[in-house]
């Protein structure tokens, strides 16, 4: 099943995000084709990264939570809130 992982950054934490970005991207890259989509959420003006959204194939929400917990961003204390929801892809057809 696919899950959407929404990670909201703590306020004024851009430096934490930027200093851990390379480690985060390497970690996410290790998930390979389990990742359908990933990228940063942006501020309302589109200028700053304020979180992350990923769509990931996994057996359970617990698996997604484990992925989120091991992310270098999470280990650095970047996230204020993490939300995991089952996701059904309709377009393009899955």
What are these regions (language model features)?
Residues 1-94:
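Conserved, structured core segments of small domains
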């Amino acid at each position: 099943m696919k899950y959407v992982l929404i990670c909201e950054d703590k306020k004024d934490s851009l430096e934490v995000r930027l200093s851990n970005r390379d480690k985060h991207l390497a970690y996410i890259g290790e998930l390979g084709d389990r990742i359908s989509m990933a990228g940063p959420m942006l501020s309302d003006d589109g200028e700053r990264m304020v979180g992350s959204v990923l769509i990931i194939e996994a057996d359970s929400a617990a698996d997604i939570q484990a992925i989120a917990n091991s992310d270098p961003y999470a280990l650095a204390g970047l996230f204020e809130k993490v939300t995991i929801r089952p996701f059904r892809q309709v377009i393009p057809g899955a």
